[in-house]
């Protein structure tokens, strides 16, 4: 009789044990899914942080690039060691030393002058600014580059200064115009500017190609105003 009374309890225990065994994999699966969900959320947060960091770095890089052309003659080579030297014995070019260059359709009210008297890059920019209220010329298309080249081919020099110069720091160096206009055109000689030396840009009187040159070199120059 006692065995018969104990039998239902034994059966109940066996069934409960089977239920626990069947539920165990389901619980483990739920825990695994929860862990995977946490890992996925963590991965998404890391991706967002990384993307934000890259955006910040890129934005800072663009700011550095923009500021490079906003600074005036930050490159030591382009700047005279003593700014007062620019004022020493300063004289504007004589009439016989200048030649008017045909204007550009891009700016119908602008004037352009070829100054035959050789100057360093900084001295030439100083003359353009103080004598004519302008800058060394900026060139934005092939046709105007050709006009400049045709006019300068009459001078007894291989090159003339135009308003391009290299500014910035390390990887953020870039070519800029002294008048602050956008650098949207270039006509480099083969191998230039990568194999060139110097931080200033000169136009070759034969062919009209551009070359990098040492800024303290004395050359004729073209002003725009």
Curated annotation (Swiss-Prot):
InterPro entries, per database record: C-type_lectin-like, C-type_lectin-like/link_sf, C-type_lectin/snaclec_domain, C-type_lectin_CS, CTDL_fold, EMBP_CTLD, Eosinophil_major_basic
Gene Ontology molecular function, alphabetical: carbohydrate binding; extracellular matrix structural constituent conferring compression resistance
Domain C-type lectin: 107-224
Tissues where the protein occurs: Expressed in bone marrow. Not detected in placenta.
Biological process according to GO: basophil activation; histamine biosynthetic process; immune response; leukotriene biosynthetic process; negative regulation of translation; neutrophil activation; positive regulation of interleukin-8 production; superoxide anion generation
GO cellular component: collagen-containing extracellular matrix; extracellular region; specific granule lumen; tertiary granule lumen
Keywords: Disulfide bond, Lectin, Signal
Segments traversing the membrane: none
Subcellular location: Cytoplasmic granule
S-S bonds: 128-223, 200-215
Stated role: Possesses similar cytotoxic and cytostimulatory activities to PRG2/MBP. In vitro, stimulates neutrophil superoxide production and IL8 release, and histamine and leukotriene C4 release from basophils.
UniProt-recorded name of the protein: Proteoglycan 3
């Amino acid at each position: 009789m006692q065995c018969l009374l104990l039998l239902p309890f034994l059966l109940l225990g066996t069934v409960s044990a089977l239920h626990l065994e069947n539920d165990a994999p389901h619980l483990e699966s739920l825990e695994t899914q929860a862990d995977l969900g946490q890992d996925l959320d963590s991965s998404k947060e890391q991706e967002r942080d990384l993307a934000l960091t890259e955006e910040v770095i890129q934005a800072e890089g663009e700011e550095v690039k923009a500021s490079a052309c906003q600074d005036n003659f930050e490159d030591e080579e382009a700047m005279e060691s003593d700014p007062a030297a620019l004022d020493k014995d300063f004289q504007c070019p004589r009439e016989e030393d200048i030649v008017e260059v045909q204007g550009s359709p891009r700016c119908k009210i602008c004037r352009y002058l070829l100054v035959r008297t050789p100057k360093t890059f900084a001295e030439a920019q100083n003359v353009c600014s103080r004598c004519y209220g302008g800058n060394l010329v900026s060139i934005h298309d092939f046709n105007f580059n050709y006009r400049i080249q045709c006019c300068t081919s009459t001078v007894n020099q291989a090159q003339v200064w135009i308003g391009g110069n290299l500014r910035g720091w390390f990887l953020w160096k870039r070519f800029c115009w002294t008048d602050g206009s956008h650098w949207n055109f270039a006509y480099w000689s083969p191998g230039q500017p990568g194999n060139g030396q110097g931080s200033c840009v000169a136009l070759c009187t034969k062919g009209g190609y551009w070359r990098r040159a040492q800024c303290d070199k004395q050359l004729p120059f073209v002003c725009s105003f």
